[in-house]
Amino acid sequence: MFIILALWLKVEAQEDPFDPIIKAMQGSDARSLSSSFNVTVELLLPDNESTYSASQGEMIMKDFFKKYPPDSFTVIQKGTIDSVSRFAICDYVTSNRQYQVCINLRKENDHFLIQKIKFEEKKK
């Protein structure tokens, strides 16, 4: 009984790897977001699509947040692809645009890190 309780507490204590990413996106915080980037990150943004180092990715996201600050950022769905891959589909709404955002994570050294962020504009 004690072992089951201990395992349950361990599972409950584990943070969802998307929590700091969601907080960073909601707060337009490129620095915090980049702390979840893998060594390289693929960013597919409206004006810019490429693979960047984590530090370059931070600058790209900082510019994006400045141009398109979020009015809201909402997670629509999260899921597990396999034991080392997770995804989230989100809505990113600005004052005059709405994007569907797909975030892909991959487990590296016991931590889930961002492999790719893709923004697709939703047509109204």
What are these regions (language model features)?
Residues M59-R97:
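Surface-exposed, charged secondary-structure patches
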Residues S32-S34:
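Solenoid-repeat scaffolds in large eukaryotic assemblies
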Residues M1-P17:
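Bacterial Sec-dependent N-terminal signal peptides
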Residues Q98-K124:
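Short beta-strand edge/turn micro-motifs at domain boundaries
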Residues F37-T74:
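Short solvent-exposed beta->alpha transition segments
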Residues K10, P70, F112-Q115:
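Hydrophobic, well-ordered secondary-structure segments
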